[in-house]
Amino acid sequence: MEADDHVSLFRFPFKIPTFRGIRKGGVYLSGALYALGFWIFLDAVLYSRYSNASDVHVTFIDWIPFLCSTLGTLIVNSIEKNRLLQGALSSDGGAFGSGVGDLDSSMAWQARTVLFFGFALLAGGLSGSIVVLIIKFLVKDYNTYPTLGMGVNNVLGNVCILLSCVVLWIAQNVEDEYSYSLTL
């Protein structure tokens, strides 16, 4: 193995840039995407409350996908990324054994399970907003823009939150040359 190679989970055919500002820029972009998604959804809520002339309004049912996406984002981005590969990188390969390797493998599976629930909440939030759009607006033949726009804004807000989570996940996983890994 060459000195340039490093152990990673995925092999990309291109080199990911590793300068200092990419992590900070990714975090800022993620925050901007979340704020945009929140504002798009809040715009639909405020329009429904104060300017809507139709008989369809934003109710708690419309908030559920948004809350699921937000909770999924919090769960996914609160997991320490080094916990996911902990058991696989131990000396025994994460196999069934005794000692520290078994504990590392257990922690890795717990982290993977929580990560799965976080991504399931994100997917449920996005699919829930699409279902609300279809059932509440399209099936009941509310297909004019100001009324249909409330459902479209719900979907767009959830898409922005999902993209925010993905950008933050990538930004947190970018390794820069100035980070040090100290293990005891």
Curated annotation (Swiss-Prot):
Residues recorded with modification N-acetylmethionine: M1
Transmembrane segments: 26-46, 56-76, 115-135, 150-170
Subcellular location, record wording: Vacuole membrane; Mitochondrion
InterPro entries the UniProt entry points to: UPF0220
Bilayer topology annotation: Multi-pass membrane protein
Biological processes, Gene Ontology terms: late endosome to vacuole transport via multivesicular body sorting pathway; protein targeting to vacuole
Main location: membrane
Disulphide bridges, residue numbers: none
Glycosylation: residue positions: N52
Misc note: Present with 1900 molecules/cell in log phase SD medium.
Alphabetized PANTHER family for the sequence: SMALL MEMBRANE PROTEIN-RELATED
Function: Involved in vacuolar protein sorting.
Protein name, entry field: Vacuolar protein sorting-associated protein 68
Organism lineage string: Eukaryota, Fungi, Dikarya, Ascomycota, Saccharomycotina
Name of the encoding gene: VPS68
